[in-house]
């Protein structure tokens, strides 16, 4: 027998935490706006927004939020844009560790941190040509919460 589990996008009754970086705020505010609108469209009424200085600081906040057991999911939003130094690689690498926290705590942690080569690419992904990755991250969070409830 084959059983297929497929979650819907009904977020009614869910609690989400959005952790958003202040660094590159002109990008991250667009991501946050997209995420909050997406949550609203999917019936989510309970969202806590936590602002952190930058993407590098996210993992410890994600860990604390996950350990609190207050939220059904955690969505991370940020923008790391490549510069002329190795700083991009360091920050991108550290922020990528966020996913392991979700596995450790059995909570969906959605990675909505843009890692781009140029400012233009980041702008495109924050609500222009390439859609809004914040909105996509929020929809993914709703779906993952529902999927985990089916397991």
UniProtKB/Swiss-Prot annotation:
The active site is at 87 (proton donor). GO terms for biological process: riboflavin biosynthetic process. It comes from the Bacteria. It catalyses: (2S)-2-hydroxy-3-oxobutyl phosphate + 5-amino-6-(D-ribitylamino)uracil = 6,7-dimethyl-8-(1-D-ribityl)lumazine + phosphate + 2 H2O + H(+). One of its GO terms (molecular function) is 6,7-dimethyl-8-ribityllumazine synthase activity. InterPro entries: LS, LS/RS, LS/RS_sf. Keywords: Riboflavin biosynthesis, Transferase. Pathway: Cofactor biosynthesis; riboflavin biosynthesis; riboflavin from 2-hydroxy-3-oxobutyl phosphate and 5-amino-6-(D-ribitylamino)uracil: step 1/2. Its EC number is 2.5.1.78. 5-amino-6-(D-ribitylamino)uracil binds at residues 23, 55-57, 79-81, 111. (2S)-2-hydroxy-3-oxobutyl phosphate binds at residues 84-85, 125. Pfam families: DMRL_synthase. Transmembrane segments: none annotated. GO terms for cellular component: cytosol; riboflavin synthase complex. It is an enzyme of class 2 (transferase). Belongs to the DMRL synthase family. Catalyzes the formation of 6,7-dimethyl-8-ribityllumazine by condensation of 5-amino-6-(D-ribitylamino)uracil with 3,4-dihydroxy-2-butanone 4-phosphate. This is the penultimate step in the biosynthesis of riboflavin. NCBIfam families: lumazine-synth, PRK00061.1-4. This is 6,7-dimethyl-8-ribityllumazine synthase. It comes from Leptospira interrogans serogroup Icterohaemorrhagiae serovar copenhageni (strain Fiocruz L1-130). The gene is ribH.
């Amino acid at each position: 027998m084959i059983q297929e589990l497929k979650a819907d996008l009904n977020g009614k009754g869910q609690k989400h935490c959005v952790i958003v970086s202040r660094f590159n705020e002109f990008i991250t505010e667009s991501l946050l706006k997209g995420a909050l609108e997406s949550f609203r469209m999917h019936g989510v009424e309970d969202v806590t927004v936590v602002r952190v200085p930058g993407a590098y600081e996210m993992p410890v906040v994600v860990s604390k939020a996950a350990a609190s057991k207050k939220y059904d999911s955690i969505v991370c939003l940020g923008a790391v844009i490549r510069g002329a130094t190795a700083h991009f690689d360091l920050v991108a690498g550290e922020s990528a560790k966020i996913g392991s926290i979700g596995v450790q705590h059995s909570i969906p942690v959605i990675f909505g941190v843009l890692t781009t080569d140029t400012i233009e690419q980041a702008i495109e992904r924050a609500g222009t040509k390439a859609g809004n990755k914040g909105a996509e991250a929020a929809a993914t969070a709703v779906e993952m919460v529902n999927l985990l409830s089916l397991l």
